[in-house]
Amino acid sequence: GKIASVANCYECYGIIYNKAILEKYCSNYSGAVIKSVDDIKDLDTLEKVATDINEHVDDINKACDLHLTEAFASAGLDSGSNWRFTGHLAGLALYYEFKDAGCDLTAGQKEVTGKYMDNFKRVWDMYTNTSAADKATLDSGSLNAESELGMEEAVFYQNGDWEYANFADDNENGYTVKQSDLSMISRRPSGLRKTMS
């Protein structure tokens, strides 16, 4: 076969989440829609959890002694952040479409059918509908999703494993989150899969 690429560095991306907050949500909040973090196995369940957290954030804060402002960290569309969605989120939908079509990546794909674009839109809508950020300001450059997760204001944050160093326990960034409290859910077109614990 033809060599399409040579692996130089392995990175993974998906949804970083604060498992300590989710565990408090499951054990201390009587209205929790899941009993355990392990119940999040598909997009339907993640949507239910994110929607519930966002809609009942004040009650959850009281029950769990938290200071959340949202379920998902802001989905900034400024040039410093939009690659998370224009590249990573869209790229996943295209990858699985090309894979299903048996695409020879060295030759290219002649047609994009958008087979998984409904799920792309569904995930994007979940990000923006369960965030405290005003949708009209997503391209303003004034949002800081990393800080929202780091200060434990958000539970979920789409990014990759390279972000882990920014949440170092040395408190250099002033964040309150502990590295040991973070985990990741990878995204698939048909659902979700936890990759780290």
State the predicted function of each range.
Residues 47-52, 96-140, 181-183, 190-191:
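Glycine-centered hinge/linker elements that transmit conformational signals in sensory
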Residues 20-38, 132-133:
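Aromatic-glycine-rich donor-binding/catalytic loop that engages nucleotide-sugar donors
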Residues 74, 140, 158-160:
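Short beta-strand and adjacent tight-turn residues that come in two discontinuous sequence segments
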Residues 155-159, 181:
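Paired acidic/hydrophobic, glycine-rich loop segments that form the ligand-binding mouth/hinge
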Residues 1-22, 193-197:
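A structural signal for short loop-to-beta-strand junctions that line the ligand-binding cleft
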